[in-house]
């Protein structure tokens, strides 16, 4: 299945997330944005992470990337060289890695990783590394509070590097936000992309308001972005509504 993995297609068919949002996220991942998935305890968190990682491997526009798993039992040391990272984990090797050849798979960002490892893993995002991150947090404000607090004490600019943030429960995506990197002293609030309305049993979709940002972050003009999004929608088996 070109450009979209079978696991992602299955999540859409199960109703875990909508096809338009899945297509948008897959394009943003192709462009190098990080993806962060939040939940307290839910197998869906890892399923979503694995599905988008598989989709990134399918992308014809993205070259091969080594997936480096940053987990609670791994102790990483990162080199200061801005063109590469060094991992003291024997499974990942110790040679510096280019930004273009690495995908970090960060698990246990809050309450799992050793604080120093978590800080350095997030700091690497500002240096251009891409990551798919799983974090134990009920929502985005709680994640920010945990990352600001002791022992992590991450600066605000690092918090804005988390890319697309999904909040999930055991069955579906409940909310999605797009974060915006700081520009100088200017910090933009997160953009709400979708929110699950439990009383109506449907998602409230706000991605239409973020289309210019999607195209800009993907380094495309709007027409090209819309065409690629339409193609992904077709692959996912759902006609585009916009």
List the predicted regions and their residue ranges.
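P-loop NTP-binding catalytic core
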Residues: 1-34, 51-54
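Short acidic (Asp/Glu) and glycine-rich catalytic loops that position anionic groups and cofactors
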Residues: 2-6, 123-127, 196-198, 206-208
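NTP-binding/hydrolysis catalytic cores, primarily Walker-type P-loop NTPases
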Residues: 10, 182-242
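Switch/coupling sub-region of P-loop NTPases
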Residues: 33-40, 49, 53-169
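ATP-binding Walker
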Residues: 42-44
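Hydrophobic residues embedded in beta-strands of well-ordered beta-sheets
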Residues: 172-174, 203
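A glycine-rich beta-turn/hairpin centered on an aromatic-Pro dipeptide
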Residues: 174-183
């Amino acid at each position: 299945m070109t450009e979209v993995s079978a696991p992602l297609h299955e999540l859409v068919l199960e109703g875990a997330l909508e096809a338009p949002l899945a297509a948008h996220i897959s394009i943003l991942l192709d462009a190098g944005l990080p993806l962060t998935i939040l939940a307290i305890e839910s197998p869906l968190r890892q399923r979503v992470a694995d599905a988008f990682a598989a989709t990134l491997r399918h992308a014809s526009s993205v070259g091969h990337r080594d997936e480096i798993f940053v987990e609670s039992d791994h102790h990483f040391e990162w080199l200061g060289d801005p063109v590469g990272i060094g991992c003291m984990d024997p499974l990942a090797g110790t040679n510096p890695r280019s930004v273009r050849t690495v995908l970090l798979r960060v698990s246990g960002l809050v309450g799992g990783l050793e604080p120093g490892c978590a800080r350095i893993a997030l700091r690497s995002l500002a240096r251009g590394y891409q990551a798919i991150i799983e974090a134990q947090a009920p929502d985005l404000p709680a994640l920010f509070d945990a990352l600001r607090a002791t022992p992590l004490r991450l600066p605000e600019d690092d918090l804005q590097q988390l890319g697309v943030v999904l909040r999930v429960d055991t069955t579906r995506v409940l909310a999605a936000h797009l974060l915006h990197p700081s520009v100088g002293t200017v910090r933009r609030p997160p953009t709400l992309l979708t929110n699950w309305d439990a009383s109506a049993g449907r998602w409230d979709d706000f991605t239409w308001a973020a289309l210019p940002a999607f195209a800009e972050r993907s380094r495309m003009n709007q027409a090209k972005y819309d065409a690629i999004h339409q193609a992904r929608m077709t692959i996912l088996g759902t006609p585009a509504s916009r």
